[in-house]
Amino acid sequence: MAEIKNYTLNFGPQHPAAHGVLRLVLELDGEVIQRADPHIGLLHRATEKLAENKTFIQSVPYMDRLDYVSMMVNEHGYVLAIERLLGIDVPERAQYIRVLFDEITRVLNHLMWIGAHALDVGAMAVFLYAFREREDLMDVYEAVSGARMHAAYYRPGGVYRDLPDAMPQYKASKIRNEKALAKMNEARSGSVLDFIDDFFTRFPKCVDEYETLLTDNRIWKQRLVGIGVVSPERALQMGLTGPMLRGSGIAWDLRKKQPYEVYDRMDFDVPVGVNGDCYDRYLVRVEEMRQSIRIAKQCIEWLRKNPGPVMTDNHKVAPPSRVGMKTNMEDLIHHFKLFTEGFHVPEGEAYAAVEHPKGEFGIYLVSDGANKPYRLKIRAPGFAHLASLDEMARGHMIADAVTIIGTQDIVFGEIDR
């Protein structure tokens, strides 16, 4: 009798459903996956090593480029670690702004995820809808930092600047007449806070639209229910965090269990799954978007009533004001020294973790008292999730591997670092 050999298939790295540069070596029995071996490192940029040669402030933009879909939350983990080593307090207003932008970033991430995941499985319309909403949030990023993606908005001691009084307006062009322009700029006549408020007032209807398209859709359920099941015990053993862990029924959320900034004042719920399959993880993330709306609304309400500083008054860390810098020589020298030489951080080590849209994003920082980190270790949530791919995909079809990669919400910037 002829012996049966398993078939080896290379999936990626140039594959539309591989979310970047994933190379999977699949061992197949017919169309059933026996083993999935992810090959990583194709997007390795030595971020941890680069940070050792840059001052503490100069490494903030590197954080944006880790998970390049959830930019500001990466920065948050990094600046929290520095603040713990420095022992400085962040002004209350800056903390609220950070929490607001963490939730904006969570929505940005989940919109990208729901669009890409649905597109991989074969539902194209959701992708277009999700990007329509992402555009508005990208504009908010641009309004506060000048960049649509890599913002570098969070700084040790606070944020780069307070929320501006005006939103960028759409300009007239060949494809937009005056009437269309007026409609597009309708929500942009007020401050950035007004625009964010308007967005989160409209957004629940948008989430309802995605749910109408997907939640009870027969094909969507056939593709997701019972696929990539992870038991609560295995989820903990494999180091899964975030929606991957909560989808298996464990209500672990750093915003509730180990609150940072002002999350302990926020009123929100932690959604958990029941079966630990792809469908449950989908439901958890959709509900997370709804909870982000609640948190953002609470932040907006507080920020409207409480003006104040957004940067610490410790001048060894905080740069002088732009106005002072242009009129006062001492301020100019101070600014120059701060951005060339940087500030010295006391000897010691600190670990700061934030509830990233993908899971627990941790920064372990070791300082030897210099103006640069001695060692920076990045704990990326996607790394543990990708490691669980083999176990989640065994016994499933090739098409289900695409679903499982989608449900893990993988971005290679943070995995390869």
Curated annotation (Swiss-Prot):
InterPro entries: NADH_Q_OxRdtase_suD, NADH_UbQ_OxRdtase_49kDa_CS, NDH1_su_D/H, NiFe-Hase_large. The keyword Metal-binding does not apply. Coiled coil: none annotated. Its EC number is 7.1.1.-. It is found in: Cell inner membrane. It catalyses: a quinone + NADH + 5 H(+)(in) = a quinol + NAD(+) + 4 H(+)(out). Its main location: membrane. Keywords: Cell inner membrane, Cell membrane, Membrane, NAD, Quinone, Translocase, Transport, Ubiquinone. PROSITE patterns: COMPLEX1_49K. NDH-1 is composed of 14 different subunits. Subunits NuoB, C, D, E, F, and G constitute the peripheral sector of the complex. This is NADH-quinone oxidoreductase subunit D. It comes from Burkholderia ambifaria (strain MC40-6). The gene is nuoD.
